[in-house]
């Protein structure tokens, strides 16, 4: 199963864990990472992840996130098709960077796009064929097979 984690998901473990929602999303993201390490899930990467991570002012976070690139099965680089698809996603309310992430996931033929961004999850019906999910939903509904 091929997945795309957006920048919000990669950064979730570094957020303040006082909120139960953030703690649950962190635990789910860490579980997903373990599934990647065990080759149960196939992680993808993109030029937008590379760019956003390079802009992170915290060297430790930047390096820890960048280390995941070696475990990826594919990387998406900018193409006219990705740019065009991103523009379509923007017409449905995705911000520019989010739209590029979504378009990269489509180009990589990912089964799931995982994000902790509530706004993207609330607009998921506009981003088909991608299945946009929060990491907690993905773990409970997909990996553990709960309806």
Predicted regions and their residues:
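Acidic catalytic patch
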Residues: 48-52, 69-91
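Acidic, PIN/NYN-like endoribonuclease modules and their adjacent C-terminal/linker elements
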Residues: 2, 16-26, 91-92, 106-147
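Short beta-strand scaffold positions
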Residues: 77, 96-99, 115
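Short, well-structured N-terminal submotif of metal-dependent ribonuclease cores
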Residues: 1-45, 54-62, 139-147
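Alpha-helix capping/helix-boundary segments
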Residues: 9, 49, 82, 100-101, ...
